[in-house]
Amino acid sequence: MSSKETIPMHQRSQNVAELLTVLMDINKINGGDSTTAEKMKVHAKSFEAALFEKSSSKEEYQKTMKSKIDAMRSTRDKRKRESVGSASMMANLGQDGTNNNNNNNNNNNNNLNMAASFMGGDMFGRNQSPAQNSNANTNLNTNVGPGVNGPNGNDGTANPQMFMNQQAQARQQAAARQLKNRQMGGSSAQQQQLTQQQQQLLNQMRVAPIPKELLQRIPNLPPGVTTWEQVTALAQQNRLSAQDMSIAKDIYKIHQQYLIKAKLQQQQQRQQQQRQQGNPDVNNNMAGSNNNNNNNLPMAQQQMQQRQQQQQQSQQQQNRNPNQRHNVLSQINQMFTADEQRALLQEAMEACKNFQKTHFGGQMSDANKQAFIKKFINSKALKKLEAMRMAQGGNNNANLNKGQADMLQRQQANMQMNQQQQRAAQNQRRGPVMNDAVSQGYNNQMNSAADSTMNNSNQPMNIGNNGVNMIPNQSQQQQQTNRPKEQTPQQPQQRIQSNRSVPMLNPTPEDVEVVRRISAEAAKTQLRLTDLTNSLTPQERDEIKKRLQKNQQLFAQVSSYAPQVYLFTKSESFLKEVLQLRIFIKEILEKCSKGIYVVKLDTVDKLVIKYQKYWESMKIQLLRRQQLLQQQQQQQQQGMDPNRAQNSQQQQQQNQANMQQARNRKPTKNQTTPAIAASVAMNMNDKGASMSPALQKAGSAVPNFAQQMSPNMTPGTIPPTNVLSPHSQSHIPMVSPTMAKAASAAALKNDTASSSRRGSTKPRGKSTAPVTGKKTSNAPTPQVVPATVPSTTNLSAAGTPNIRNKSATPLTAGLSPKSTIRSNSNTALASAKTPSPMTVSIPQPGNSSVFKKEEEYLSKLQLRKEEIRFRQKQRLDILSSSPVDLFLTTVADCLGINDEEIELINKIPETTADNINNTGKKKLTKAAQKLRDKEILNVSIQVGEKDKLIMSSKAPDKVMDYSISAMSLAAVFKNLSSTGSLNNIALSGSNATTSKDIGNIYSHTGGVKRKFDEVEISPNSNGSPSASIMSESKKIKIDSPEDMFVTHSSEAAKGTNNSSLMDSGKEGSCKSMAGSATEVNDTSIWDWNFWTSIE
């Protein structure tokens, strides 16, 4: 046996050419167009390639190819003979109809072409006389076209397009003869009254919309013409040529045949249902009795009725044996197009791969694979066939005037089903695509496996359609069979359906297996993360930390509820993607907690947006599930308790409104709507919609960091997004540069960095209200009292722990009054929230307008402070190459000069100007543009002869005054020397002052670590020292810049007011009170009037 590789390429090309020649002949007989011919070329090449791959030897390849070509040739010859015979039969029948039209004494009226000519003559030619119909008991059942299921119905390869072309050609010839005979004897023909059924059909034809497929074949029709009545009006107006009229008449007859056949089938189905209800035994003798009644019918009509009887008998056998599986692979080529077949084959192969992984551990024989694919495709074909049957059965009692837009589609499906039944009996030929993928062997052991796989992959829950669309094929057959017998009340049926759909909400073993498998696959994901720490600026690192920390619970929610969403969506791709992202997020969080950054800021933004979209869609699915449960409960309560059913309906309407709100809302932030979250959580807890233990066990195959972050969160409830467990924040250290820590049980965290990024934060009015009572906790919270009493201040600088001095300390220079007020306000608010037995709750006024003026003033001060910081940062970045411009613009800010009036001395580099104005070749990325949009000022550079740096405010008033008092500005330049030249200006005695300050501030321990002295907590505390207040971890290095804000107790006791700590200038305000004649009393900082008196 020679190898198939020895076959030369020219021989293979010759085989393709021979096969293509036969296919082209068949296409020409069928009346196909050039598009079909191009598809034939592709099919021929695909068939030869598949056959070559499938063949094991050269002899097998040649033998199979020869047999296939011979079979195709025989089919072509047979098609030619049938086409000629059909044309001649139609011509003869048309001639008989013409003779009957000319003879008024002929009582035989069983030919359908005569009825068609009646309708066509009355429709298109009012002056033409139809033939006399003296047979009063003629039934419409005899008016069946001989070509509807004529000789072409016996061919296993015919299609509806070829059938329509043949019938149109035959009827056109018959109509031409009839038209000629009528023109010859039209004056002598007598008008005949139509029967009631024919008149009804004629009226229906006048108003019925012409199907789109037929309407396109009529040339020169103006737009808007959709009925035959409109076409007739055009003909009477002579707007259609004779050729157009001839084509329109042929199309009219085809449309008429469709309506007649549809009505005939409906009538036969009603008769069949009546016989089944009356006496089931009559069905066994139905073929014989019907044959006795058809002795006087033409041969074509008898053949058609015999085929319909066979179809009915086969359907009855299927109804008696609903569990029996039929092999309809022989009809694949007629049920699916070539593209659909390829897609179906690809889907079957994917399902086979998944089944192989889950049941055979990667090992599966070729025979089993082929049997599985064959079973999969056969089940698909059965489902499509059953769907067509249900569509046909559901339209039995429908009005013919309704649903006429899709009438042609249903009729084509019915015609296709009739031909498919005949081809199933012959089983002569299979599709060119499916025969090569499926072998002849059939393994019955794979049936249940293939069915379960298809049900899992191709039957998702359709929760939005008041039920779960997971009915198997056998159940559909039983419903179709028992449809006429379903005369019982609807209420028990609804209860049965609800009882059937309830178990479907619980996870099946297949669901658990899929979740476990996907979790295992996600755990094996290889992550290659690059350390980007050195390439990121400190600001970017802080921003990444804050965003990851802020969205931790969003990540946890999506990961926790993904298995539940999979239960009623069956979307494996969604579950796999979420689990893979969970591994990715977990790795990022672990690296970030160690100070290693593996992603950039724009990547974090993309992840957050993706998770927000996930959560929005998951909330909609959860609401749908809740709605389904309520519908089932409502169906069960109907007839028992009307009040409970009404309440259930109201709750269902509320859930629908919430779901619509969730759809319309854009996912901007990871915040769950309180109404939606509470509603879903309450209902899912009440109705037991939580995840089953089996699914929880399957989902725990991979470590779920979401459960660690929220240990109290159950799978059945939607957690609120504004609550984070203490353990969840342990993954990433707090990002805030300002942190107030206490040794008590309640830890107070104040993130000033996030508040500065958001803009203004309004302190609550109760921060200034008097507090009565006393706290015994160690929280560093001074109590606000209106009187002037000796107290110590707890002013914490940026990033330092709380610093306490035993003696009274004056107001630290460099700290603005608004900073002290905000610190005290936040501290008082935190003390009110701290659980303690000694805490006295502060009554909050019902009307918040009492401190509205103060709140607006503080908000304006906070906004001004943030803008000053931002302006100074922008000047440092843009004017770093020009110290003169940096100095002068800062002084101009302090003097309140507008930016547009300031002209820079040196030119700004072109690259810097293009980057700021975003006018260069390299545009900003989306992430960078988002960051720029979040900035509190609009920055731009006016390029000209003298450049200008413009920073406009986004505040509502658009104008902000950044000037400071003249006294404060003069204090900065108080100790200047050599003011004659700008290059020689210096601060006199600055070095000595710095040395003295350092000597006063730091202890003389030689640069070793030291511990702060323990002091009292608040002004009213007893001040008992405790060793637990400051641990060893709170020691500060001597070279720390934060020690600049600490005054040693021994030096503070002297009450020296000469040393002053000037502000670093980052705010640009330079608000230093050093050197002023007014000495600040330390007790006056608690007096509100003191701060309002400061300008």
Curated annotation (Swiss-Prot):
Family membership noted in the UniProt record: Belongs to the Mediator complex subunit 15 family.
Pfam families according to UniProt: Gal11_ABD1, KIX_2, Med15_fungi
Ranges annotated as biased composition (Polar residues): 155-165, 448-473, 794-810, 817-847, 1050-1062
Keywords: Activator, Nucleus, Transcription, Transcription regulation
Function summary: Component of the Mediator complex, a coactivator involved in regulated gene transcription of nearly all RNA polymerase II-dependent genes. Mediator functions as a bridge to convey information from gene-specific regulatory proteins to the basal RNA polymerase II transcription machinery. Mediator is recruited to promoters by direct interactions with regulatory proteins and serves as a scaffold for the assembly of a functional preinitiation complex with RNA polymerase II and the general transcription factors.
Record GO terms (molecular function): transcription coregulator activity
Recorded name of the encoding gene: GAL11
GO cellular component term of the entry, any: mediator complex
Gene3D superfamilies: 1.10.287.2920, Coactivator CBP, KIX domain
Predominant subcellular localization, coarse grouping: nucleus
Basic and acidic residues composition-biased segments: 66-83
Highest taxon of the lineage: Eukaryota
This protein's name: Mediator of RNA polymerase II transcription subunit 15
Subcellular location: Nucleus
Oligomer and partners: Component of the Mediator complex.
Keyword Coiled coil: no
